[in-house]
Curated annotation (Swiss-Prot):
Keywords: Cell wall, Hydroxylation, Repeat, Secreted. The modification 4-hydroxyproline is found at P10. It is found in: Secreted, Cell wall. It comes from Phaseolus vulgaris (Kidney bean). GO terms for cellular component: extracellular region. This is 22 kDa cell wall protein. The keyword Secreted applies. Its main location: secreted.
């Protein structure tokens, strides 16, 4: 299964920008 792009999922973005 290939997950959609990160920009398509605002929940799987890196948590670097708290």
């Amino acid at each position: 299964q290939n997950q959609p792009p990160d920009f398509a999922n605002p929940f799987i973005i890196p948590q670097n920008a708290a």
